[in-house]
């Protein structure tokens, strides 16, 4: 309890850690909130596991937490644990819901808000403090009847031209405005040669802009997905190419290495090996530009890491404007797609206005204008150039690797140790099922039948880390010499190779060698060969493998 213990409480703070002074210092005192209205409860954590399961969280919430909240006549809950918040609010994500006060999934008379734990202020203050501030202001406003959800009324002017003439007129108006613009596209895929341009937006400030369809063709009368199909709008593409040629001011993107990369190919290149069009597009699109993803990286980078996505960087401004990330724009109604696209453009302005001054104040402007911008041009050119592949050789090498893979699988399957382990797994399944069943009994025949099902928990799977751990360390009895970041016994290829030095058993040595071969070949067959097989065919008869580089990540410039 806080304040007068005899006063009825309106708000309950839920926390895994209960420290009265830390809670007051973090959530109450900085915002001038009445302590008499608050109480706090600790949240149950399963002592047997590192992370409490969702099933346990739900059971505790339903049987213990909600009854107590009702008994205390609590109207608001400030939850400082992300997993409990998901259960209480009935949402899938936490960060996109910061600043929202949502009805409780178990009782609509209780409202729930999320704020990071006070402990996070110690190890990640730059991210935790703004989120706590946003959450507490929203909660206070809701208590006073002045609540406005994040993203409400951010659009002051929006136009969605839908004819060739109105699109042309608006592009002329944008040129006449003689000011910087933000630009964002929605496309059909992540690869430049299949992306097309579904829709595009241009915004001239944080609250005004336009958006229009390009290659997205609405399906007339559609009442369920798909709502559109992919086309090729030659006329609108020509207008866009001409617009970018005429544009004299900076255009601001969030992740220019995607948007401009797609636009260069779709508007200026005839095919995937059109180097003349590529260089022309680079000259047009990459002369005057800004990238708020790079700006955000330089303004917010810390040892604790940062999420550079537009949704995260602009969440306090636009809220949760898309419940799910768009994976297939044809499943989005055209009006919603355009509204979503427009808010992306407005949000890009917000992120620019928020982080650009910080980047300058942190003395990062020189590296941004120099190294980062010049590297970005190189990255986009590399992404559009690709690497030529001899597909006949790819097919040939795949067959060789498959032989090696099959050999490794056979050696593993033929090993008596593995056969015994697989048998023990079936026995364990039989024991577990019979303990669950009231009358019916299962036997080895049922276990064998279970093995035939596509998804089952009986089959021996060499790709399963828990099974490998059990086989190598529990069944065979090899020593644990390496651990994963999660403090689990390591079973990666390098560790398995080292384990050869810790046994003289010929059966174990043969098995370890088979695992080493299996791991190496499987990685190439599943990770590299499929990408090569899907390489794009160029007009010269060669296939081209294209990749993407991430500048502004933990490992910058990594393919």
Regions found by a protein language model. Give the residues of each.
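Metal-dependent phosphoesterase core characteristic of DEDDh/y 3'-5' exonuclease domains
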Residues: 25, 89-126, 203-207, 257-332, ...
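Alpha-helix capping/helix-boundary segments
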Residues: 83-85, 258, 467
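Well-ordered alpha-helical segments embedded in enzymatic catalytic cores
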Residues: 60-64, 131-138, 166-169, 235-239, ...
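Conserved RNase H-like, two-metal-ion catalytic cores of nucleic-acid enzymes
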Residues: 5-13, 17-39, 149-309
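Conserved "right-hand" nucleotidyltransferase catalytic core of DNA-directed polymerases
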Residues: 144-225, 281-282, 305, 316-317, ...
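Short, surface-exposed connector motifs at secondary-structure boundaries
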Residues: 71-72, 242-248, 450-452
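Short active-site oxyanion
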Residues: 73-76, 246-251, 457-459
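A polyanion-binding, active-site-adjacent surface
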Residues: 1-149
């Amino acid at each position: 309890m806080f304040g007068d213990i005899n006063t009825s409480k309106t708000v309950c703070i839920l926390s895994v850690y209960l420290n009265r002074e830390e809670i007051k210092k973090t959530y109450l005192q900085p915002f001038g909130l009445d302590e008499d209205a608050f109480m706090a409860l600790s949240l149950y954590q399963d002592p047997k596991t590192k992370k409490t399961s969702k099933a346990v969280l739900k059971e505790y919430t339903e049987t213990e937490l909600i009854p107590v909240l009702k008994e205390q006549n609590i109207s608001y809950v400030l939850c400082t644990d992300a997993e409990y918040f998901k259960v209480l609010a009935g949402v899938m994500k936490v960060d996109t819901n910061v600043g929202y006060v949502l009805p409780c999934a178990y009782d609509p008379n209780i409202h729930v808000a999320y704020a990071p734990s006070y402990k996070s202020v110690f190890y990640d203050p730059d991210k935790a403090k703004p989120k706590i501030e946003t959450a507490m202001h929203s909660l206070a406003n809701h208590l006073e009847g002045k609540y406005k959800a994040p993203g409400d009324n951010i659009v002051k002017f929006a136009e969605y031209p839908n004819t060739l003439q109105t699109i042309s007129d608006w592009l002329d108006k944008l040129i006449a405005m003689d000011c910087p613009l933000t630009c964002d596209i929605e496309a059909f895929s992540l690869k430049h040669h299949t992306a097309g341009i579904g829709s595009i937006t241009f915004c001239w400030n944080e609250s005004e802009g336009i958006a229009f369809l390009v290659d997205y063709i609405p399906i007339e009368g559609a009442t369920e997905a798909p709502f559109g199909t992919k086309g090729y709008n030659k006329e609108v593409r020509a207008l866009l190419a001409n617009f970018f040629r005429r544009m004299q001011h900076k255009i601001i993107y969030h992740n220019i290495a995607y948007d401009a990369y797609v636009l260069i190919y779709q508007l200026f290149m005839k095919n995937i090996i059109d180097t003349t069009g590529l260089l022309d597009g680079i000259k047009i699109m990459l002369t005057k530009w800004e990238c708020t993803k790079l700006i955000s990286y330089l303004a917010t980078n810390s040892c604790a890491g940062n999420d550079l996505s537009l949704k995260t960087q602009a969440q306090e401004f636009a809220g949760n404007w898309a419940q799910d990330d768009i994976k297939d724009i044809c499943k989005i109604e055209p009006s919603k797609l355009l509204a979503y696209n427009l808010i992306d453009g407005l949000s890009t302005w917000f992120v620019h206005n928020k982080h650009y001054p910080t980047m300058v104040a942190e003395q990062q402007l020189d590296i941004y204008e120099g190294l980062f911008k010049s590297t970005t041009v190189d990255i986009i050119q590399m992404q559009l150039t690709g690497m030529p592949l001899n597909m006949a050789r790819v097919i040939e090498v795949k067959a060789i690797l498959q032989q090696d893979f099959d050999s490794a699988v056979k050696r593993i399957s033929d090993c008596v140790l593995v056969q015994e382990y697989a048998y023990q797994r079936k026995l364990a399944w039989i024991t577990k099922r019979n303990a669950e069943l009231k009358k019916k009994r299962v036997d080895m025949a049922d276990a064998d039948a279970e093995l035939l099902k596509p998804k089952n928990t009986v089959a021996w799977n060499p790709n399963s880390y828990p099974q490998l751990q059990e086989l190598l360390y529990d069944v065979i009895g090899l020593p644990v010499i390496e651990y994963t970041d999660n403090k689990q016994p390591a079973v990666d290829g390098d560790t398995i190779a080292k384990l050869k030095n810790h046994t003289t058993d010929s059966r174990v040595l043969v098995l370890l060698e088979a695992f080493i071969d299996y791991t190496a070949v499987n990685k190439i067959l599943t990770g590299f060969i499929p990408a090569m097989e899907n390489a794009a065919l160029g007009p010269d008869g060669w296939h081209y493998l294209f990749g993407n580089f991430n500048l502004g990540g933990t490992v910058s410039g990594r393919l």
